[in-house]
Amino acid sequence: MVKGPGLYSDIGKKARDLLYRDYVSDHKFTVTTYSTTGVAITASGLKKGELFLADVSTQLKNKNITTDVKVDTNSNVYTTITVDEPAPGLKTIFSFVVPDQKSGKVELQYLHEYAGINTSIGLTASPLVNFSGVAGNNTVALGTDLSFDTATGNFTKCNAGLSFSSSDLIASLALNDKGDTVSASYYHTVKPVTNTAVGAELTHSFSSNENTLTIGTQHLLDPLTTVKARVNSYGKASALIQHEWRPKSLFTISGEVDTRAIEKSAKIGLAVALKP
């Protein structure tokens, strides 16, 4: 694997994962099995209030080609074909949704020691074109993320980001929403042995003049059990505990409470993922 600045989506990813990943407010159940030919079959169910959603997906790997097919409760069929390393550092992704005739898209990713590029184009007469690029190295990375609608001739997305990384600290700054919001994030590894880390994200909106601050932490109680907690400037506090009771099989329970309205019921989420 090429070491370098990565893709634009990697800027601030460590802090985002710490603050938002694995927190659930619904009930989710996922089971994965493998056939004798190596095909992975995954069934998922999600209960959101009175609504229940389900999907079934399969994954087939043949050398450097991976094919993913997913069918949801609305009879939509999502297909993604990924060709890994047709050339050094290159990845090609072709995706489409049936019956949506305008969903076809081709995506190219290229990773280099000093750059990372991701570009995609819709397979329509007037496609949406996306481009993101990062230049730098393992320490400093500077990038941009753009989307251009050829039908209207307008840029629908224009973002920029900067990241600084060291052995135990990652800091990033991003300008999003065509310059309307700016976000700064921070991730610090306190104790690698127990995966103890702290993180924070501060977002300012120029149009509304509002600030949002979220801080969080994580810690390994034992090699198989992780606890996380976070709180934001709106007074919402969340916590979760995740246990890997067998390899790749996770049980997660999380809760959220509004400290400014304790009388309201707390939100409790549950996620179970089973893999052989």
Swiss-Prot record:
Domain of life: Eukaryota
Description of its domains: Consists mainly of membrane-spanning sided beta-sheets.
Stated name of the protein: Mitochondrial outer membrane protein porin of 36 kDa
Keywords for the protein's UniProt record, in alphabetical order: Ion transport, Membrane, Mitochondrion, Mitochondrion outer membrane, Porin, Transmembrane, Transmembrane beta strand, Transport
Family listed: Belongs to the eukaryotic mitochondrial porin (TC 1.B.8.1) family.
Coiled coil regions, renumbered to chain: none
InterPro entries, A to Z: Porin_dom_sf, Porin_Euk, Porin_Euk/Tom40
Function of the protein: Forms a channel through the cell membrane that allows diffusion of small hydrophilic molecules. The channel adopts an open conformation at low or zero membrane potential and a closed conformation at potentials above 30-40 mV. The open state has a weak anion selectivity whereas the closed state is cation-selective.
CDD domains listed in its UniProt record: Porin3_VDAC
Signal peptide, first to last residue: none
